[in-house]
Structure formats: structure tokens, C-alpha cells
């Protein structure tokens, strides 16, 4: 199978977690599929939420929702540094007393992911591949909102193959429901053997993978990033590419 890979990075990012009546806005810890599709929609020149009107979905999501992607954090333990940024909001509806209200956002810092896109035989896939290979973006690309410029580099086209083994480390974010747990190597006495050569880590977060067709609210799945060996359950979306194992979703 043909796979488009590129590195996506930025100095800061903000992927807002929906909150009601809150003046501290928190960010998801990673770019998620819906936000990534929005960025790809900007590459293609598709409309967003502001131009949705009465349509079921915003244009970028309607056209790109069936694209299979995989997201691989480019750091050692799955967590980026975070910092609270404070803004002054003096619009009339922000404060019933008419004063200045501080709005706080949690920004991710120095973010970087490898992004994988499974290329199918459709016109949208072909155009997306051509645009990214040639850095021909219709609109400016951002990491969540327009305070956070995104950079794409290291673009390459790779060949992947289905991965059907029962146990493996997984190098991308993957769905928790796709595994049966984690493999524990036994020592000669039948006890779990410790790997003293490295520290194991496990990052888990509920991240948006789709939009609800009526409310357009995020539909989330528990995703994991870890260096532990996993026991695979549903192998249909796992792929081996460049000697790494990733899951498409």
C-alpha cells in the first residue's frame, strides 16, 4: 500500500477541549484526527465551520472524513510541555460589568509529529498527495487556531504492508480497543521480567476521531502511546512501514 508521510511541527499548538462557561480553556495533548483533517482541508482549500451553513458537516470534514491517518508523536514519552497563556478580553459580552476579563488558554510547546496518510485511488487522495509533495497549500495551515502556525517538511511516499503478528510495540498513537493488553515477558521463575535497559512509559487520552452527524460534537476514542509491547486484538488497521508499526484510524 502507498503511504504519504510528513513531519508536522510548530512552536505552539492549541487543540481546544470543549468546555462550557469556562475561562480556562484546556488543550488536548496531541493533534487529533478531526483537527488534522481541518489542516488538510486548508491544504486543499475546503471550507470550515464558518461556511457550513445548513450542511450536515463542514466541507473539509465531508470531503476528508474517510481518509485514514496515523499520528506518531516525535518525543520520548508522549507528552509535550504545556504553558498557560493569559489574554485580555474586553468585548461587551465577555463581562457583564463591562470590564476587562482575563481569558486563559493552555498551549502545547515545541510540538512535532510524523503524520501518515493511506493513499487510495481517488481524486481527493491524489490531489492531497500532489499538494503536500509540492508544498502547494491553498490556505495557511495552523495547529488548532491561527495563533499557531504549522510547518510541514520531510515529505516522502512509502510502501507499507499489513501487520498481522499477535504481539508488537506500536510506534504511533493507537486505539485502546485494538489491543488486549500489554505483553509481560516472564523470567525463569514465572514472574514478570523487568527490562532494566529502558524506562517504560504509557500516555493515554480520549481524543476526537470523528464528528457526530447531527450535533457536530466530537466523538472520542481512548488512544494510547507507549513503548510497551502490546497484545493485538483487532489487527485490521495495523501496518508495517519503514520498520515501524502504526495504526490507521
Q: Which stretches of residues belong to each language-model region?
A:
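Extracellular structured ligand-interaction cores
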Residues: 1-3, 66-68, 110-114
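N-terminal, Lys/Arg- and Ser/Thr-rich interaction peptides
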Residues: 1-24
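Residue-level recognition of well-ordered beta-strand positions that form the cores
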Residues: 7-9, 70-72, 116-118
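Long, contiguous hydrophobic alpha-helical segments, chiefly transmembrane helices and signal peptides
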Residues: 8, 37-39, 107
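Sparse, context-dependent recognition of short Cys/His-centered cofactor- or disulfide-binding micro-motifs
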Residues: 13, 25, 54-56, 98-102
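Glycine/small-residue-rich interface belts in oligomeric ring/scaffold proteins
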Residues: 18-91
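Internal, well-folded beta-alpha domain core
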Residues: 74-249
